[in-house]
Amino acid sequence: MKTKCRIVTFLLFFVGVTFCCNAQEKGFLTTYSEPDHSWFVTDAIETSDGGFLVSAYDYWGPSSLLLKLSPEGDILVNRGVMAEDTTIYAYRILQIPEDNGDEYMVLCPSHPADGSTATLMLLRVDEDLNIVSRRTIPCSFFDEGSRFFDAKFLVSDECVFAALTSRLPTSSFPNAIFLARFDLEGNLLNSQRWESDSLKYVCNLFHDGEDRIGLFGNIGPSHMGILTFDQSLNLASRDSIFQWSSSEGVGGDFCHYFIHDMINSQAAMLPDGSYVVSSRLLESLHYANGHSYANDRSVILAKYENGFHQPENMLVTEHMNDSVEYPAFFRSVDFSETAEMKCEVFQCANLNEFPQFGLIQPYPTGIVVTKTDQGLNVEWKKRFLRDGNYQAMVINATSDGGCLVVGSLGDFQAQRFDVFALKINADGTVGLDEIQEEDMAFVYPNPAKETVRVGGVEAVETEVYNASGQRVMNFRGNEANVEALADGIYILRITDDKGLTQTLRMVVNK
């Protein structure tokens, strides 16, 4: 297939800038770099014309960056964002449809250089990224001198909701979380303060049913949960979720599983009213002899329908001591509804492997993207960009049935990185010869009752191990009956027709 690749170098504020775009129909890989900046990507959205906007902030400060990409991946506009004596973090892009074209609101937590209390800057930009207005909102509800620890945003028809986590200037840890509501002009409508003992961390905000706002986070102590609020920020419900235990065989061993309290955990409410969660999975295995073992190398995509104590369906990776996987940093799950009233769910995770010779720090070895329906039935699961230091930050479901993955590329040890954007087609292809696309295995249904199937690859042999490491069965082909297995958690070691081996986690729950 014919592809196009071009490298263009030009001057921006007397600084050399390089970008590269490889494009073929819908799929592309675009990179952007500036030698004196280290861009940490925070958000991306699809525009009404099928293009994309990307935001990033300079890791070394004090500026931020906005990029506009065409539907083919060409960089049309790059816009630096700076303010005098202030460090700006472009965190979130929100689209605001206007009668005469599209406008966008960019929400930027900001730190004044004089050490005074943090502010929230609201930028309105037009479709060419020209700044239409700039407004600085004092965070008067913060304690004096407080800085931002984190910020999450959500837009509705008439207002913007924010979960703003503050830290005192003498500490690196959060001290309080403020839920705030602004109108689209940036006027503060109301706010509420939550202390860390009742709401420790906010992972994301999302639209819930009945015109409510959902908040997914750590509601303490060591419990992940979902809070819902009405439009006036009054608490409507509070549920602890995503924890369960399972006995392992007949020896008295048991395993406790819960969603990891991580910044990159995400929850969303799907059109059918169910919840989907993307997170790292923390596994704590307790042996009958008193010994215990903890592992958090796995990523889970789980669906909850009736209550929050056991997933209705889930996809769980399993990694041995040589690798670790974790979800995309700022948005690891997204979904879209198609014209046929279908819902398509995408999850993105980073796969890191540990080098040989006892070195501790893992290095990036690919981005894993999974596409499912809203029942988490997998359409495809693939690894991209095995070669190169690519770290996914955001995944966006796109209107054509595919997705866009954006993130940072470069040397994370030295904290020097550039921007990349990878457009994946609806069928899981990119269409570029230089981008390796590897099929990844998945197992379904999960939890299993009678029959389990291996998808994604042609399985030659599958070995099944219990949590104690004992092999309890093996089968050839892509399907097996598991009725003889006791309820519990099992590891599947799958060898495909290419001789490659992958490991997955399966739950048997009859």
Named regions from a protein language model:
Residues E25-W39, I75-Y89, R134-S146, L188-K200, ...:
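Short loop/turn motifs that cap or connect beta-strands within the blades
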Residues A44, V54-S55, L66, V77, ...:
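Hydrophobic strand positions within the blades of repeat-based beta-sheet folds
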Residues E46-D49, Q95-G101, L154-E158, H207-E210, ...:
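Residue-level detector of Asp-centered blade-edge/turn motifs that repeat once per structural unit
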Residues Y59, D433-E463, R476-A484:
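Glycine-centered coil/turn sites that cap beta-strands in beta-rich domains
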Residues Y59-P62, H111-S116, R167-F173, I219-H223, ...:
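Short glycine/acidic-enriched loop and turn motifs that connect beta-strands
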Residues Q391-G431:
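Blade-level signature of beta-propeller repeat domains, shared across WD40, Kelch, NHL, RCC1
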Residues I424-Y444, Q470-R471, N509:
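Residue-level detector of functionally pivotal "anchor" positions at catalytic/ligand-binding pockets or at interdomain
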Residues D487-K510:
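C-terminal tail/sorting-segment detector
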